Curated annotation (Swiss-Prot):
Name the record gives this protein: UPF0758 protein PSEEN5431
InterPro entries: MPN (IPR037518), RadC_JAB (IPR025657), RuvA_2-like (IPR010994), UPF0758 (IPR001405), UPF0758_CS (IPR020891), UPF0758_N (IPR046778)
Pfam families, per the entry: RadC, UPF0758_N
PROSITE patterns per UniProt: MPN, UPF0758
Species annotation: Pseudomonas entomophila (strain L48)
Top-rank taxon: Bacteria
Lineage, highest ranks first: Bacteria, Pseudomonadati, Pseudomonadota, Gammaproteobacteria, Pseudomonadales
Keywords: Hydrolase, Metal-binding, Metalloprotease, Protease, Zinc
GO terms of molecular function: metal ion binding; metallopeptidase activity
SUPFAM superfamilies reported for this sequence: JAB1/MPN domain (SSF102712), RuvA domain 2-like (SSF47781)
Span of the annotated motif JAMM motif: 173-186
Residue sites binding Zn(2+) per the record: H173, H175, D186
Length: 226
């Protein structure tokens, strides 16, 4: 059935306007973004099919370009719109933390780091550089690939910290497997970087690991001692 034939209050766009975005299901939210269906499938049927095919809303949002464009009803225009939407979200998160100390809102900082890393298909390692009041100066992804002591160069982390005139920083990396539990290499790497950065009076505030669910703070679990 064409959505125009539905009761007005049940159409996704009208439902959003009348009840708020929080009242919509994942399929309805995706349908609002898509805007229209394809031949033989209305937009809500298309949205439901995509959620099943990709495995959920997060997987649709994080799909790579080739996989996204390979689906019926999706094309370069919708892909570019989606990427713009995701970047707007990341920048909004960045603005929410840029004028305050990371100590004042650690949850917002972890959510920002998750937004920056969760879409990465392979392991990446980054730093959020902080000023003397622990306010963000810059975020950079420094290394890609398997994250261990052999692939991370302390001198590069030190160099970037000096370049940004950072007084402190938060280390971060992702676990594409979804499991946020740190490995022994993660712990040893963190302590090695902590010692290297201490030589230039730069403090490691935390090391955040991004996976499924809430990011893990190594400082909160006692893994930064030493």
């Amino acid at each position: 059935m064409n959505i125009r034939e539905w009761p007005v209050e049940e159409r996704p766009r009208e439902k959003l306007l009348n009840r708020g975005a929080g009242s919509l299901s994942d399929a309805e939210l995706l349908a609002v973004f898509l805007g229209s269906g394809v031949k033989g499938r209305n937009v809500l049927e298309l949205a439901r099919g995509l959620l099943v095919k990709f495995g959920g809303l997060r997987q649709v949002l994080e799909a790579d370009r080739q996989a996204f464009l390979g689906e019926l009803g999706l094309g370069p225009v919708r892909y570019s719109q989606l990427q713009a939407l995701l970047e707007i979200g990341r920048r909004n998160l960045a603005m929410s933390i840029e004028r305050e100390s990371v100590m004042d809102n650690p949850l917002a900082v972890r959510r920002y780091l998750k937004a920056m890393l969760r879409h990465e298909a392979s392991e990446v390692f980054g730093c959020l550089f902080l000023d003397t009041k622990h306010r963000p100066l810059a975020f950079e992804i420094l290394f890609r690939g398997t994250i261990d002591r052999a692939s991370i160069y302390p001198r590069e982390v030190v160099r970037r910290a000096l370049l940004h005139n950072a007084a402190a920083l938060i280390l971060c990396h992702n676990h594409p497997s979804g499991n946020c539990e740190p490995s022994q290499d993660d712990v040893h790497l963190t302590l090695m970087l902590k010692r290297s950065l201490a030589l230039i009076d730069v403090r490691v505030v935390d090391h955040v690991i991004v996976g499924d669910g809430e990011p893990l703070s190594m400082i909160e679990h006692g893994w930064l001692a030493g």
